[in-house]
């Protein structure tokens, strides 16, 4: 293992600390709720859902976090302003944890940014994400909001190489007038969480691991990803899924360890139902990484899995 020469930033979002040197802080884990085709959602457009089932899932993630010491974030996914508003209200009612506001639609993300600012929850909200498709109206909405935490996505549709992704953050890679980090500054983002973006296996999925290390070495910001998207989009594995769903789950959950070994600080692990599997897996990796850097002068946090489970 290794220690970065660059000072590593630790951000604090609603009490959850993210970042630092490998082995210093436990990996922060974010499970997604209300995702596409989530069985608890009854009306996608209006955001109607089974409240009891949703509460149980949120509590499931919380209890997993309490046991292993890995902090958690609730990843809210919505497709309309009405739905994401309902989801935010519910999550804030049930949990004190920070939450990601995520949507494939920029207008929905913009609405969510405005809404959390209006109701006084901007300090708990993490915008997902500032990326190459962001337009002037979305930038304006985010800048006018009170949100100061955001994921910054290193996806480059024209060049998925390490250089292409790094340049997207640094200078716009010739596709934007400025880099995404500069846009984040203009939007008032203080807590920058870099996501190298997970592309399909065979199309640069592994580059994200290299970029995690490279980005932390260059900028020192907390870095992580939704690495499970690589195995979940793997055609070969999906053909095996119907016959052996356990095999699929092993690969999906196991990908967590790869991102951690590449110095990842946070992981968007997908369906929140996977919490009972993800948290022990992440805790195991955190313990081994912390032991591996012990001779480099890196002390684990008091509630690190190394201090709770060994």
UniProtKB/Swiss-Prot annotation:
InterPro entries xrefs: Dihydropteroate_synth-like_sf, MeTrfase_MtrH/MtxH, MtrH
Enzyme Commission identifier(s): 2.1.1.-
Molecular function via GO: methyltransferase activity
Quaternary data: May be part of a complex composed of 3 subunits; MtxA, MtxH and MtxX.
Family label: Belongs to the MtrH family.
Gene source species: Methanosarcina barkeri (strain Fusaro / DSM 804)
Keyword NAD in annotation: no
Name of the protein described by the UniProt record: Putative methyltransferase mtx subunit H
Keyword Isomerase: no
UniProt keyword terms in alphabetical order: Methyltransferase, Transferase
Enzyme class: transferase
SUPFAM superfamilies: Dihydropteroate synthetase-like
GO biological process: methylation; one-carbon metabolic process
Highest taxon listed in the record's lineage: Archaea
């Amino acid at each position: 293992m290794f220690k970065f020469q660059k000072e590593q930033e630790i951000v604090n979002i609603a009490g959850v600390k993210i970042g630092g040197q490998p082995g210093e802080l436990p990996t922060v884990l974010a499970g997604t709720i209300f995702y596409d085709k989530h069985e608890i959602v009854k009306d996608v457009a209006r955001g109607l859902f089974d409240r009891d089932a949703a509460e149980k899932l949120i509590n499931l993630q919380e209890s997993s976090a309490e046991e292993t010491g890995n902090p958690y974030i609730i990843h809210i996914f919505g497709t309309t302003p009405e739905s994401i508003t309902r989801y935010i209200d519910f999550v804030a009612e049930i949990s004190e944890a920070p939450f990601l506001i995520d949507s494939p639609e920029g207008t929905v993300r913009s609405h969510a940014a405005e809404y959390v600012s209006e109701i006084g929850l901007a300090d708990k909200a993490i915008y997902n994400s500032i990326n190459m498709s962001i337009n002037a109206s979305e930038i304006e909405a985010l800048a006018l909001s009170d949100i100061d935490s955001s994921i910054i996505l290193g996806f480059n549709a024209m060049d998925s190489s390490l250089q292409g992704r790094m340049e997207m953050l640094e200078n716009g890679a010739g596709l934007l007038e400025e880099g995404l980090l500069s846009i984040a500054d203009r939007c008032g983002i203080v807590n920058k969480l870099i996501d190298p973006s997970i592309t399909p296996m065979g199309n640069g999925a592994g580059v994200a691991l290299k970029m995690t290390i490279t980005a932390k070495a260059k900028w020192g910001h907390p870095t992580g990803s939704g690495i499970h998207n690589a195995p979940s989009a793997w055609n070969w594995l999906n053909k095996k899924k119907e016959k052996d769903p356990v095999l699929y789950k092993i690969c999906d959950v196991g990908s967590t360890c790869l991102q951690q070994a590449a110095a990842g600080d946070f992981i968007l692990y997908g369906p929140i139902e996977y919490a009972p599997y993800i948290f022990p897996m992440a805790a195991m990796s955190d313990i081994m990484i912390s032991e591996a850097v012990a001779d480099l002068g890196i002390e684990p946090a008091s509630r690190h899995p190394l201090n709770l489970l060994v």
